[in-house]
Structure formats: structure tokens, C-alpha cells
A protein has these predicted regions:
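C-terminal interaction segment
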Residues: 7-74, 81-126
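Short helix-capping segments at alpha-helix termini
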Residues: 1-4
Length: 126
């Protein structure tokens, strides 16, 4: 993975084509892409390194079940589900192939793919 700022952050609306079909794309709330070769005029063609979804009542099933499975299959390295209703962040570290970790908003969430980065979600809700 590139060091010294080689990754870029994209926010919705931004198409992520995780299958070889432009008709089947997702628009994550936030995605971090470290491989510039995946970027095109259509969006990101392939799996971003890290995706963050903010759950809403209408997206709960999609974020926790449908997108989780799709992101895992596509090769996303890390997936965070930020859930305001539950005041927690669920972290899937697909690189480690481990069970998800659930962290309350008032505790720091350690990023798996960027070891020097941790985020306390409650700091951004004030």
C-alpha cells in the first residue's frame, strides 16, 4: 500500500463498481482507495481498500448484510459500519478473516490497514 499520503478519500455520491458490470455498482458513504489504477471516469473499478457506511433506518439490512457480503467477496480490506442508533461501530477486518469487532462511539477504533490511525467517533458527533 502506498505510504505518505498515497491514498485518497471519496464520499458519496461516488460509484464503486465491484463487479465487471456498470449496472451493478454501489455508492459507499466513504471509501478510501490506495490504487490509483482503479480510478476511472466511471468511479472506482474494483474494491476500495477501506469502506465506511453510516447506517440509517432504511439502509440497515443493506449495510449489515448485503453490502458486507459483497465487499468481502470483492476484496475490500476493511469495512466499518457506523451505527448511530446503536452508538457503535462494527469493524470487519477482511485481511485478518476474523469475527467483527464492535466498538462504542466513545472508544477509539483502530484502523487495521493504517496502524497509526484510530478514530473516536463521538469526537465527530459534537
Amino acid at each position: 500500500m502506498p505510504k505518505n499520503g498515497g491514498c485518497e478519500v471519496y464520499m458519496a455520491p461516488f460509484a464503486v463498481i465491484i463487479q465487471n458490470d456498470i449496472k451493478n455498482y454501489v455508492e459507499p458513504d466513504i471509501c478510501i482507495i490506495c490504487d490509483k489504477d482503479k480510478l476511472s471516469d466511471r468511479g472506482c473499478e474494483g474494491a476500495p481498500d477501506w469502506i465506511i457506511e453510516i447506517v440509517s433506518p432504511s439502509s440497515r439490512k443493506t449495510d449489515y448484510i448485503i453490502k458486507n457480503a459483497a465487499y468481502s467477496r470483492a476484496g475490500v480490506r476493511e469495512y466499518w459500519i457506523v451505527d448511530p442508533a446503536k452508538a457503535c461501530t462494527t469493524v470487519y477486518d477482511y485481511d485478518k478473516d476474523a469475527a467483527p469487532t464492535i466498538i462504542p462511539f466513545d472508544q477509539p477504533v483502530q484502523c487495521g490497514i493504517f496502524p497509526d490511525l484510530s478514530i473516536t467517533v463521538s469526537d465527530y458527533l459534537k
